[in-house]
Amino acid sequence: MTGTIRTRLGDGSLVEMTTAEIRADLEAGTEIGARRSKAPQLTTAELDHLQDIFTSEARFSAVDMGDEVVLSFDGSGNLDSGTRVDELYSYQCHRGADMLELFGMDYSYKAVKTILSFEAQTMKTAQLNLIAPLQYGAMPDLGRYSMPDGPIPNWSELMPLNRIDEARDAQVAAIEHAVADMVYCAEGMWEAGADGMDFDTAGAAGDGDFLAALTAIEKIKGRHPDCGIELGMASEYVLGMHGQLEYKGRRLAGMWPAEQVKVAQEAGATMFGPAVNVNTTKSVAWNVARACTIIKPAMAVAEIPVHPNVGMGVGGVPMSPYPPADAVSRVSRALVDILRCDGL
């Protein structure tokens, strides 16, 4: 192949690259992913396979027959038309979803708590109309518990003032509120017939946010062992907003997916969703090579199903309101073929 290939950047824009340029991006992506996460680089054979995927001139790409994986969704059904139940039905019957999620538009358990009775009734109605497993999902969203929206002093304001101990204490106090709200919502949804719970974008506010999710999962599984629980991450790396928080002896700050999945399964999660954010100025090939490199070590230690996040802006999927299908299909195939993941 001597000409140029039409491919995508991380923002979804169409660009033309040569085979040599795509190969160089693949090698650069795995190199920086390995260097940052201290993981092995992808093998030559894996890079060759990715090159085949991204240099193909086909409009779509797909896994081989027999290699299909489960498609789970966080936030399926967003009132584009009709009711949320209508949207869930559309995801099940028209989009091929294997697992569905009911959610509130605020997507925060702090907000859901105030409308739990309404959400529980919607869950019950949805369960009567659907066949696919249906979970309820939202974010731990630890930041909402800080002032002015919450009762806790704002640690983001305290830290620049060098009031570090106060900032850490504030995060610990916020964790207690967040855990209570997540457990409360889970109890209501379980009674309404939910098949599971999703704690999505965990770690968005740092290690305290991640600890809140893990603690809530442990409490819920202790009460309801049959409840499915998905833990989806906010990023490939847990930020140390507190810096000293631990879960069962493991420091959370600085964790990459291989360590994240260990604490997730120890807490009782039944599915783990690693997230690797995209660089919008780099090619999709570069982003996919980096994502595969960062997630691959987690596959070797995971004892629960792993579903890499492939929403807009994560996992290699372009950051665009409507990610182009040619890019999404290549990203999906690459993650399944290289990682041998359980789903997406």
Where in the sequence are the language-model features?
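Active-site pocket-lining segment
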Residues: V306-S320
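Alpha/beta enzyme core
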Residues: T2-I304, S320-L344
